[in-house]
Amino acid sequence: MLIAIGIMFQPLQYPTIPCIIFMVIVGLGLLFAFQFILGYGFEMHRQITIKDRIAFRNYVVGKIFNVLVEHSYYGLLLSTFNLFVYKKAITIRLCFIFAISIVIFWILGGKLIKKSLKLCFSWFYFFINPSISHKCNSK
């Protein structure tokens, strides 16, 4: 989730390692901010009024919108000469981030993730071919 959130806000003009560090920091910050907004994971949310929570949410959403507008604006300012290199760098970074996220996903999840994926695929397969379930039940 951190990497997925961070991809939206990565400064694409910077090198890869600082970009990944930035994404993790921004992802953590946004994760805690949204947990705070929704009231999950914090005991203090009971003491905060709804008015304060709405004001904080509007502030965070405004900041996110400003970051998106800034990055899209700077992206449009790139010259056509640098556009090919820019797109190539984006593609390489996204592939690298995707590979890292898959490795982290399998390492942290372990057997629980494998079991849940098997369950999901079995349900998906059942909806595609329901006659399989009758064969399984008859055995």
From Swiss-Prot:
Keywords recorded for this protein, A-Z: Cell membrane, Membrane, Transmembrane, Transmembrane helix
GO cellular component, one term: plasma membrane
Membrane topology: Multi-pass membrane protein
Subcellular location: Cell membrane
Main location: membrane
Membrane-traversing stretches: 19-39, 64-84, 89-109
Entry keyword annotation includes Transmembrane helix: yes
Name by which UniProt lists this protein: Uncharacterized protein MJ1489.1
Organism for this UniProt entry: Methanocaldococcus jannaschii (strain ATCC 43067 / DSM 2661 / JAL-1 / JCM 10045 / NBRC 100440)
